[in-house]
UniProtKB/Swiss-Prot annotation:
SUPFAM superfamilies assigned to the protein according to its UniProt record, in alphabetical order: S-adenosyl-L-methionine-dependent methyltransferases (SSF53335)
Keywords, ordered alphabetically: Cytoplasm, Methyltransferase, S-adenosyl-L-methionine, Transferase
Protein's name in the database: Ribosomal protein L11 methyltransferase
Gene3D superfamilies, per database record: Vaccinia Virus protein VP39
GO cellular component terms, semicolon-separated: cytosol
Enzyme type, top EC level: transferase
Localization per record: Cytoplasm
Length: 293
């Protein structure tokens, strides 16, 4: 399907307002890119890149009238609407652009993220996760997602039940089941993310083992392992809920944490977790541990 792509130049302080306006205007997905070329596709729940200046590429349905869209956004954003560009990405051009950017990527010893439709030669024992060119909400390219994927790859989760809190695309829940977990529930507060999780689970043949729910609609569930890739402030606010989401003796991994924030996150759990040494990737940190009480 062709897409209308709108590009804006956004100051970091205006990003929340612009993000919300684009979503309300019907954006299907958004990509953030810094001046240095760093790309972040559809940040996780509540996550925003900490850059001074951000280029935002937003995709809209092909029937969207760009002039009417500009008028709508200008009315909402005023002077914050800067750098406007609009172009139509035809079917082949859009998919080609995605495939050119996303090569198969390895995480840990076994996991590979592969664009749907690509058939790369992977090493023996590789566990591929297929993602769609039109995917929103995360692809593994961001450091926090990479840290979580590598953690899952190194954990003995075979036959166990997991919980992916703030699942976005469901990439972590899908990866867990593809690595041998019996089940991994994906929960998110964004309805589009719930749909994306279900679609990606179906795409990878694990739909029955990756149930997806809105946060406030999920059934009671206590997991053997839990992974949450959301902002540090949200992890702090949800510490009790996250701790209670995993059984005593179970494992949890938390990311979306900037260097220097890890102690604040761990302290929020007020004991009851035996923490491992933090793992770092760039400016980001993953903390993991075992629930002891």
């Amino acid at each position: 399907m062709a897409q209308l792509q709108v590009t804006l130049e956004v100051a970091a302080g205006d990003l929340d307002a612009v993000d919300g306006a684009l979503e309300l205007a019907g954006a299907l997905s958004q990509t953030y890119q810094a001046d240095d070329g760093t790309v972040l596709l559809e940040p996780g729940v509540g996550e925003h890149p900490l850059w001074e200046q951000v280029r935002v590429d937003a995709l809209f349905p092909p029937e969207t009238d760009p002039d009417a869209l500009h008028t709508l956004l200008a009315g909402q954003l005023g002077e914050r609407l800067r750098g406007w560009q609009a172009e139509t990405l035809e079917d082949r051009a859009w998919e080609r652009e995605w495939l050119d950017h996303f090569r198969p990527m390895a995480f840990g010893e076994r996991l590979w993220i592969v664009p749907t439709g690509a058939e790369p030669e992977l090493p023996a024992g590789a566990v591929p996760i297929h993602l769609d060119p039109g995917l929103a909400f995360g692809t593994g390219t961001h450091e926090t997602t990479a840290l979580c994927l590598e953690w899952l790859d190194g954990e003995p989760i075979a036959g166990r039940n997991g919980l992916d809190y703030g699942a976005g695309s469901g990439i972590l829940a899908v990866a867990a089941v593809r690595l041998g977990a019996a089940c991994c529930m994906a929960v998110d507060n964004d309805p589009q993310a719930v749909v994306a999780s279900r679609e990606n689970a179906e795409r990878n043949g694990v739909a029955e083992d990756v149930p997806s729910y809105a946060v406030d609609q999920r059934p009671a569930y206590c997991a053997d392992f839990l992974v949450a890739n959301i902002l540090a402030s949200t992890l702090v606010d949800l510490a009790d809920e996250l701790r209670d989401g995993v059984r005593v003796g179970g494992r949890l991994a938390l990311s979306g944490i900037l260097r220097g924030q890890e102690q604040q996150v761990m302290d929020a759990f007020q004991g009851g977790i035996a923490w491992d040494a933090p793992r770092c990737c760039g400016d980001w940190v993953l903390v993991s541990g075992t629930r002891t009480a």
